[in-house]
Amino acid sequence: IKYKFNYGYIMEVNRYKYSEMIITDYNFLVPLDYENEDGEKISIFAREILREEYENKHLPYLIFFQGGPGYESPRPIADSGWIKRASEEYRVLLLDQRGTGLSTPISGESFLGMNDNDIASYLTFFRADNIVRDAEQIRENLIKDNKWSVLGQSFGGFCATHYLSFYPDS
């Protein structure tokens, strides 16, 4: 399923049941460089976890920023741990931050034909400031003007703090 974003970006959605959870996988196209929104786009992957028993309830969202940097979000293999507890009150959104997991990766191929300065410049697009811009784009397009809760672990805690500093009303 494809949807148009508010800003013209495309969102792909795949929804399925796993264990006692309803999983919705999203792929969002966002600018590599937010100063050049018409330029190159990258894909940001996010997975929504919703307990099957709450499928028809309007639960608020909780976005989770993973630690690292450089690690993808956790993959739910069972209805347990912090995800189980959080999913009792929220739709949990697990974000693969830019360059990680199922989002557009950073790999050796990313740097083919680049000199050291070009590589350093390219990597600046994968910092916390752009990770939180991605999250805000996703929030605006997924839940519009509604607010969500934010949780982060390790580097993800830094991203959560950064997000709350830049988007305190989100």
How should these model regions be labeled?
Residues 13-170:
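Gly/Pro-rich cap/lid or specificity-loop segments adjacent to the active site
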Residues 1-10:
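Short, Lys/Arg-enriched N-terminal segments with co-localized hydrophobic residues
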